[in-house]
Swiss-Prot record:
It comes from Psychromonas ingrahamii (strain DSM 17664 / CCUG 51855 / 37). This is Regulator of ribonuclease activity B. Disulfide bonds: none annotated. Globally modulates RNA abundance by binding to RNase E (Rne) and regulating its endonucleolytic activity. Can modulate Rne action in a substrate-dependent manner by altering the composition of the degradosome. Keywords: Cytoplasm.
Amino acid sequence: MEKALSLEELLAEYREETEEIVEAILEDGSNPDAVYMIEHHLSCTDFDVLEKAAIACFKKGYEVTDPEECELEDGSIILSFDVTVEMNLDEEAIMEDIEKLVVLAQSFSIDYDGWGTYPEE
C-alpha cells in the first residue's frame, strides 16, 4: 500500500508539474502575456459531496462548472467539476490557487486532479 503524501510533498509535486506545464506552453509559442483560462479539476464518486465542494469553491469566489460524469480507463465512473480562473500564466498565482483547492479538496475527501489550460496566441 502506498503511503499518502503530506500536504507539503503534494504541493512540491504540483509545483514541479506547474513549472513543466508553463514551460511547455511557452515553448510551443503561446503568448506569455495573454490571459489564460486555467481549469482546476476536482473529482469523487459521491455527487452530494462533490456538490458541497463545488458550492464551497463558489463561496470562495471561484467560478465552477457543472458536474460531469467521466469514465476512467478501467470503466469506473467518477464525477467531476472544474474551477476556472482567468489569469496570466503566472506560476506563483497558479500555485496559490492549487494550495487553496488542494486543502479544500482534502477537507471534503475529494480528489484535486491537477490543472490545465489551452494555448493562446
